[in-house]
């Protein structure tokens, strides 16, 4: 028998307290998916629309990744609100990415009160600890309880303010009893115009320089999330900087271009390795990081979820001065041979690419012409890593490299474009585009970002062509299997999909046309499609490798 006695505050009062606590805690954006059980929070957000930015998405999976993009773009915590049931489960992919990427994503899940759980009530399941170890903190706020303590603790956990806890996602599960709406005559409307927020930005650590007396032939590796401090460190110590695109350190006088091919020639000369962020893109870099004969140091100034103590062989250093002492300063000749080799390699790369409209040429042109760039997983991020020529100042580059999935990329880019309020370009393959094509759906009246989606369409999974599967696919016994299970060819019409969601569309058929299109400003939403053949990929990469190898005289 259900206990009819209820105590504590009502659902609308609880929801208003949640929203005010979020705003005071520095939350600037909330993504909402419609539902009934989360209605109290929806109405509370509507009352606070002058104090907080609310985005509406129909699909919860897209909502989760949109919130992820908003958090990445704003460098601040962002909440995503769903109703109960499977709606919450649809957030799991975004939560997993936020976990491994260290993004402060707050899941606000609505739930039935305790007396309705386990009774067969509609749309009711066990939502507590649904995300397991992927969240830093999870709280079940009972119906009628004051929600502020859970919100404050959740924000502290999401921002890494708790001892030993890395920045990342949290879940706040709010149980609401009927009534789930304000007074139906409108008399209960309580607008929240403003609330003094605290500073909830994610801190960037830029320590003071410490000169070292030692000299080593050290290289600085900058992986995802390294930030501009990696460039600063390499420049101050006179060292070559090998930076992945989403490190946001691939710029400045020490940055080296197609470094993964140069490593084949210079690896034996390297005496020490310093790692910022999390490099994941190439096997030559992975091999260098795992060389037991080399002293290697991983700079880790704060806890990181992708690192477990005792699981990696590098020396872990959290202090800038100690890192400087380990690294030493590079000799002028050490840096010069890398930079000279880069000049030769870049020229050889241009010659090898020619005027052919390939993924590498596309990435090279995009890197040089974009200021706010989102890059999808699989081949696009690796094309940018090989072909993106370092600039004097880095474009702002974003990528979902926490778990490096292809899901949710359009939604993530949409969130980034909204948060930064800057024209944004997204580079993706066709499968990544199709996987999140639902992310193009904006409810009528929602803010439209300035987002240009550049799709490299090779009708399937091109990355497998460059892996061992490509070699196996040449064998008659496996050719059909490799094409079916890894190639996954399709006949999707991207122009029709773009039209269905109200985006402008252009098929780009030449490098000259591509350059012209990239010179035009990004306004509203559009799709540029570039069609290539997967079968040509291995040959192109072989030509590039051979051309660079032949050009090096250092």
Swiss-Prot record:
Annotated EC: 2.2.1.9
Pathway: Quinol/quinone metabolism; 1,4-dihydroxy-2-naphthoate biosynthesis; 1,4-dihydroxy-2-naphthoate from chorismate: step 2/7; Quinol/quinone metabolism; menaquinone biosynthesis
Protein name: 2-succinyl-5-enolpyruvyl-6-hydroxy-3-cyclohexene-1-carboxylate synthase
InterPro entries: MenaQ_synth_MenD, THDP-binding, Thiamin_PyroP_enz_TPP-bd_dom, TPP_enzyme_TPP-bd
Any single Pfam family the record assigns to this protein: TPP_enzyme_N
EC top class named in words: transferase
Key words, A-Z: Magnesium, Manganese, Menaquinone biosynthesis, Metal-binding, Thiamine pyrophosphate, Transferase
Gene: menD
Cofactor(s) the protein needs: Mg(2+); Mn(2+); thiamine diphosphate
Superkingdom to which the source organism belongs: Bacteria
Lineage: Bacteria, Bacillati, Actinomycetota, Actinomycetes, Micrococcales
Family per record: Belongs to the TPP enzyme family. MenD subfamily.
Protein's organism: Renibacterium salmoninarum (strain ATCC 33209 / DSM 20767 / JCM 11484 / NBRC 15589 / NCIMB 2235)
Cofactor detail note: Binds 1 thiamine pyrophosphate per subunit.
Subunit structure: Homodimer.
